Amino acid sequence: MSENARPPAQMASGNPDPARLRFACHVPRHAASSRRLVERQRPTAMTEPAITPALIQKHNLTPEEFSRLREILGREPSYTELGIFSVMWSEHCSYKNTRPLLKTFPTQSPRILVGAGEENAGIVDIGDGLAIAFKIESHNHPSAVEPFQGAATGVGGIVRDIFTMGARPVCAVNSLRFGPITANGVAGENGSEGERGTQSPAADTSPASQPTCSPAATPSNVMTNRRLFAGVVSGIAHYGNCFGIPTIAGEVYFDKSYEGNPLVNAFCLGVLRHEQITRGAARGVGNPVFYVGPATGRDGLAGAAFASQDLTDESAEQQRGAVQVGDPFMEKLVCEACLELLATGAVAGMQDMGAAGLTCSTCETASRAGTGIEIELDKVPQRAPNMTSYEIMLSESQERMLIVVHKGREDEVKKIFNKWDLPWAEIGVVTDTGRMVVKHHGAVVANIPAKAIADESPIYQREAVEPAYLADVRAFRLEGLADVTHGTDAIGALRKLLAWPTIASKNWVYRQYDHMVRDGSVVCPGSDAAVIRIKGDSVPQGRPGVSACDPPHSDIRPPQSERLIALSVDCNGAYCALDPYEGGKAAVAEACRNLACSGALPLGSTDNLNMPSPLKPELFWQIKESVRGLADGCRAFNAPVTGGNCSLYNQSPAGPIDPTPTVAVVGLVEKPEHVTTQWFKDDGDVIILLGAPVDTADPLQGLGGSAYLQVIHGKKTGSPPRCDLDQAATLHTTLVGLIRAGGVKSAHDCSDGGLAVALAECCISQLVARNTPRLIGATVDLSGFGPQSSSPASPGETAAPRPAVRLDALLFGETQSRVAVTCAPLDANKIIERAKLMGVPAARIGTVGGDKLTLKAAAGESTWPLPGLHDLWWNSISRAMS
C-alpha cells in the first residue's frame, strides 16, 4: 500500500518499517513503539525528470514565468528548483494576482504592533503591556477532497501561525460555506422539508453568470453536501478539542454556488506580552537551524500549488495526496515546547512549516532577515522511504517548525525538545549569501536567491470588466411580487425563514466543539459575538523588557487586570454576488455591528478573500470590488487589516462560487458589566429599534438579495441593501455608548431575515442549561412604520414620491444599520433621547413578556407560539443531517 493510501490514523502516526530506515538525530523515548518515531531512509539514487514544456505547464508556471525563473538562476533549473518556484510563485503563497489590491487596505493604527504582511499574523496592543495575535486562513480545496483532514489541518495551521508569533492560542473561530443540505432548502417539523417557492433556472456554468437561488438541489448533491458538512465540522471539532482550544464563534451559510467547492476558513487568536513578539527571521550568520516536529512524509505534497488551481473532479482525485494529515496531540506538544523555548531567549527566529512546507519556511526566514540559509535534506527526519529532494522540500506534513537558535545555546534547546519528547534535528545554518542552498546526498539540488522566491514573484494587473448579468440584477423591482399579508402568509414566511439552515440555530455544529476549555469563555456561540476573558494564565511565560528572541534577564509579570475580547466573523455571499462593493462594506459593517451589540468597539480585522479565478475579467472585477468594499468598511470603523489570506480559483465544473470576502473583527470590551447578549431578559422590558425600520430610498426596501426573497420567492436577485458607512459607524458608537452608560439589557442586530427573524431570535435563543431553552415572548407594534400610503415629496423635492412601505419589507427586509435593544421601562425615554441626539433614529416598538411573539402592523397582526418557533429554529439542521 502506498503512503497516500494508508488509513488516516496510520498516516498521522507515520510508523515506517524500521528495517528499511535508519535513525535521525533524536528518537522519542518510547522508541520503536512511538507513533512519532523519527527515522530516515538510506540514500537512493533518483533520476530527476527532464524539464519540458509539459512539465512546466504541469507546475502551473507560464512560459513568461519560466523565462524569468531562468533569468534569476542564470541557468536551467533542477527539478527540485522547478517545484520550489512552482509553489512559491503560486497564488496561495505569492498573491501575484491580488497584491496590488491588498495594498488598498487600511493597515495603520497606534495599536498595531505587527502589521499586515510583516509576519505570520498581525499583533494588536490591548493595553497593560498585553497584545493579541490573530489571523484567518482558508483550507478550501483540501476540505473539498478530504473534508475531515482538510478542515482539521486548517485549524492546526492557523494555530501554528499564532504560537509562532510567541502568543499562546486561546480561542478559535470558523466561517463555513456548503451547498444546500435539504432538497427544498428548508427543513420543517419532524424532519419534513418546507414548501418551496418558485425555483430559479439551473446554474449557468459560464464564468460570471446570474447568481442562482440555493433552495433547488438534487438528492445526490444534497447527500454530498451533507457529507462535506459533517466531515468538516467533525475535523474542526477533533483538532480543536484535542489540542485544547475553545471554538467560541463562527458562521455557516448554505448556497448552491458552494456545491462541490465548500469554504473552510479558520481563525485563531492568541495572547502575549509586547516583549514576547517573535519574528520569523533567520537572523545571525552562523546560527544553527533546527527542524522540530514529526517526520516528513508525502502527505500534503505541493498543497499550495493545488490550492491555486480550479477544483475539478480530475484535479481533486489527482491531488488527494496533497491533503495534509494532522495530529493535534503532537501540535500541543510542539506548542508548549516552543513557548517554553521562547522564554529562554535562545531563539533567534521561528517559522512554522505551513504552505509549501520546508521550502517556504527556509526562504521566507532568510528573506525577512536579509541573510541566507543552507540546509541538508539528509538530516531531515523522513517517515516515507526513498523520498526525493523535490518531495522533502514540497511536503506539507503537519506540526513541523523551523527554529533558528543562537549559536552556543544548542544544548538548552535540545533539552527542552527532549523534555517534551519531540523529534528534532539540526539541519542547517544561517549564512551571509542571501541564498537558499539545499543539499541532498552530498549534491546541491537547489541554489536560489531567497528574496527572489519569497518576495519577488511576478505581479499581475488583471483586467476587470463588470459582468453583464448585473444589468438584470439592478433592473429587478418588486412590482408583480406578491406582498405577504398578516395571518397565514406572514406566519408561514417566518417559520420557513427560521427553518432555513442558513438562519437556523447552528447548535448541531457548535455542540460538537468544546467552547469552554481553558475557562475563559464569557459569551459562547449563540449570540451576536463571542466574548473571551484574557486571564493571567493565558499569557505565555516570558521576561519583560526583552524580545522573546533575545536573552532573558528577569522574572515574568502577571497582567494587572483581565481583558475582555469580542470576536465576530461575517460575510453574505449573496450580497457580494449581486453587488460586490456593497457586499464587502456590509460584511465589515455586520461584523462590527455584532461587536457593538456585545459592548465592544473594533481593534482590528483580518480578512479571507474566497474568490473564483482572477483570470476571467468578469470574475476579477468581483474580486476588485469586494476588496474596495472591505477597505472602505475597515476605514469607516477604525478596524485596520492586520493580515489575512487570499483563496482564489474557488470554482467547480458547475461554476464559480459567489465571491465571499469573509472578515473577522476583534474588539475590546472595557468592563465586564458592559458585556451584552442578544436574548430578551425580563418581562415588562421595553423594546427599542435603533436605526430606520425600512430604507425607503431603496427601491427594493431592503429585500434585494434577502433571505426572504430566496426562501419564499425562490429568487436571488436585486441590488442588496445599501450600506451607508457613516450611518453605520454612528450607530455603533452610539450603541456602545448607551451600553457603557448603563440601562441596555440586550442588543441584537437585524441581518439575515430582517426584523422579524431578529425579534424571534431574541425570544428563543437563550439557553439556561445545555438542553433547556428559556423562551420569553414579546408584543411588537410596527403600525407606525407601514404598510402605508406613498409619502409625498418633501418641500423643494423634485423627485417622485417614495413608494409605500411593504409589509414583507418591514418584517423581512434587510435594511442595514438596525439593532433591537431592550431596557427597563424607566430607561426607555433616556435611551431614545440619547440615540436621537447622536443622529440615530430610535423608536419604542414593543414590550417583552408572555409565551408568544406578536407582530402588529397597520393591516393587522400575526402571532407565533414560541415552542413551535424554537423547535423549527433549533432542530432544522439536526433533522436535515439525520
Name what the model sees in each region.
Residues 1-46, 184-219, 538-562, 769-772, ...:
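Intrinsic disorder/low-complexity segments
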Residues 45-188, 219-539, 562-792, 797, ...:
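Glycine/proline-enriched, intrinsically flexible loops and inter-domain linkers
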